[in-house]
C-alpha cells in the first residue's frame, strides 16, 4: 500500500563506512536490507529514533543523513506496526542530502540525536 504522504525531509541511518563509499561513487545505494529489498529504507522525523533503537541499538560509527524529498520519488509504504515509511526505489543522489550528523552514544549506549528532531 502506498500513500502520497509528504514531508520536506526524511532520514537515513548509515555507517561511516557506507557514507565513505557513497562519497566515492557520488550516489548512495543503501546497504544490507536496502539491497535485499530493492529500495532504500528511510524514516520520518517521528520514526527515526525508534528505527535507531530497533535496528542499530548500541552501534558505533553511525551517521544520520537528513534528506530533502522535493526532487525524489518517495513511496510511503506500510512497514513496522502498519506505519507508513518512506522508501526510495532508486539511488539517492548526494545532492539531496542536506546534512550529515554523527550519532554518538551516551553513557547508557543510546544514540544522541540532533536537537532539530525534537521540534
What would you call each of these model-derived segments?
Residues 2-119:
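Conserved, structured core segments of small domains
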